[in-house]
Amino acid sequence: MIDPRARRRGPQLVHLPTWSQLSIATRQHGAVGHGGDFFEIIQHRDGHVSTLLADVCGNGPSAAVPVSRLRWLVRQHLAGGEAPGAVLALLNDAIVAGDEPDLFVTAVCLRIDPQSGSVNVASAGHLGPFIKRASGDAQELLTPTGAALGIMPGQDYPETRLDLDAEDSVVLVTDGITDPLGTASSPLGQAGLLAELARARPAAESICAALIRVTTPIKHDATVVVLKLPRRHRRVTPVRTATKR
């Protein structure tokens, strides 16, 4: 999905097709020209969209080496139609059974119905999704999380379900956004991310740009994935909130 040559030029805004009325945008920065962060997005025949964002242990070329193999596994399991928790469990067992015993990965996986606004989310040691409301408010979904992928076989990854409102955005990030290793004055953290989300303009591309801008310069892999719903009428239950100022 992302041209490796573009990644070597620094942070890049990647425009993805509008699928099932979702507006999707990402921005990604790979440390030292290469990165261990990656994501995949797949549209199913029923119109649902699945995405997985992963952070491979390490930075730079050493983390980038297994990414191509992991991408293949992710695509296979997402395309198979498994629920997010099952996708993570299958990936975990595949990594444990592989030939890289020191490899572990954090990941968040979700499946979204653009028509109803329902979202199912599962996490493997990764930050859960953040929600930017159409009103401008920002929320963190505090999902239960299983173990990082690749540590032990036979792990379970519980799912959380939520219902989104019209024009709400789901925001996925890696820890390069919340805890950068660059020369930013201080780590953004979850609270800072919520504040920046509340201030950001509502377009998916604008959200990506705002989060990268506030944590630049970055010396750690950093990725933002934003999926924005079309106009409808639904609601979302907040957990932790920040109000747009």
Question: What is the meaning of each model-derived region?
Answer:
Residues 81-87, 199-206:
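Short, charged, surface-exposed loops that flank catalytic or proteolytic processing sites
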Residues 131-134, 181-185:
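Cytochrome P450 core scaffold surrounding the K-helix E-X-X-R motif
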Residues 205-215:
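Low-complexity, intrinsically disordered Gly/Pro/Thr-rich segments
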